[in-house]
Amino acid sequence: MPSFKLASWNVEYADRTLSDLEVPDGPSAWKRRNAERKIDAIAAEISELDADILFVCEGPRGEERALKYFARAAPGYELVTRNDPTGKEYGTLGIQWLWFLVKRSFRIAAAITPSLLPLATWRAFTETESDGRTKDGKWLVALPTFDKTTGLAGASELVRHSHYRHPQTLVFDFKGRRIEIIGVHLKSKFVDQTDPQKKWVPPASPAFDDIAAAMKASPGFITEAVKARAKTSSEATDVRTYIDRRFAQEPAPAIFMLGDVNDGPGKELIEDWFLVHDLIGNLQGDVFFAKKFLNHALFDFPDALRWSVQFEDELDPRRHPNILLDHILFTQALTGDAAWPLRVKGGAGKVEHDIHERVNSLLPKSIATSDHRPVSVVVTDVSVGPG
């Protein structure tokens, strides 16, 4: 087995699709028919993607629903679970869960036994590495406040925060080497503000002065935007803290990090005005500590194709709608001539535009497989021949 394919895909509200599949006959039966077309198309896209290990964002809530969904969407794959019907051991809120699927034929051929890292282990490692700043999976973060009486932003306050969706880490031994794949879904949850004092006042034009005026006229919205970025940035920092702890345990751990990393609207504006870091920067680490720096699987993918979603940024209309939200990163132990037994070679990463568009060309936009395109990387087993 000279190589295997690792992929990440946000399948967009799989839990809702599963619920629609269970709609009975009657006036709403059209929902079931649409869901059947959608999940069959998702199955076709997963089949064409042909990943050996697939990380899924926005999967169904809980093991029982996930098993039911993937039995239809990903036949031939095994869902890696914690054998926890309560779901508590996943540390995930909401209905958008994170799942790893391993192709059955790959598991057998590679002779691996994949499992999920206990959250207790993750939390113990981050607590140690952070010198106690993180404890029991929670940490302090300074969040801005908004005074509804005055309509002005107030002083920041320290609050305890934790992962909304705790990262799930797939672990297995490959020819004597421990491999870890950290799956994440970081996403701001503030955009649909119903409070009139926290609404966004759209700019009169894309000119910077008009955008600046809109930001000044929307203090409640901007407060929520900065608050959301602070939360997700702290979650990214916790992921990086876990990775740093692994480097404190061995000189060159073999770690992948992949998933949907969404900074939210107004990414560059929020960073420039409020001096916050982008999430990928937090995750990659400090380039001055090069051995710990994470490489990006898409760094040499053509610029014009290096995007996975199309969104109009309501805060910054100057921003190009083609945005890379889905990422695959990996440690230095997986690249270069010294990498063994697995190596990520140049040109191995890809956004799967062709497969995604081919499958969705047969569907109405209302039931497209997803608003995200899958991303993937081919990992070469250099122990079986020339690297």
Where are each of the predicted segments found?
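Short, solvent-exposed beta-strand-terminating loops
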Residues: S3-L21, I179-F208
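A long, amphipathic alpha-helix that forms part
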Residues: I222-P251
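A short acidic, glycine-rich active-site loop
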Residues: P27-E36, E224, A228, A297-L298, ...
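Short secondary-structure boundary/capping segments
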Residues: L21-D25, F70-A73, Q197-K198, I270-D278
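Structured beta-strand-rich core segments of catalytic domains in phosphoester-bond hydrolases
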Residues: G59-T194
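N-terminal, active-site-proximal structural segment of metallo-dependent hydrolase catalytic domains
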Residues: M1-W99, D210-A217, K231, A236, ...
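Metal-dependent phosphoester-hydrolase catalytic domains
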Residues: G62, I108-A111, A120-W122, T145-K148, ...
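Active-site metal-binding loops of divalent metal-dependent hydrolases
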Residues: V11, G59, L186, D260-V261
